[in-house]
Amino acid sequence: MAKQTNTLRIIAGEHRGRKLNFVDAPNLRPTPDRMRETLFNWLQPVIYDARCLDLFAGSGALGLEALSRGASGVVFVEKDAKAAQRLNENLQLLSYYNIKFQTKTDLTLFHGEPDLFY
């Protein structure tokens, strides 16, 4: 039996059709293409230049799609170190270098005054 390759596809925007790998983890289930397409069709009027928050980022499918469609920035929050590392590699592969990345495992990320509003 062939080993399954864990890939996600960017649906639209600058990186349309681009396939990216993500880690094989038992609880990691990227948002399916069709659901992402529907979600971003609804958000299309407001996604350009928006700041987005991808909580429990996992593969980063939602945040990567937002960036490809013109979001000005995304904060990815992911506690799994392997998933976070692969997501960071995918960001670099797509030439997204100034993206905020959090690996905190508790709510200390949200204590105090926010530096950005979403």
Segments the model singles out, each with a brief description of its role:
Residues M1-Y118:
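Class I S-adenosyl-L-methionine-dependent methyltransferase catalytic core
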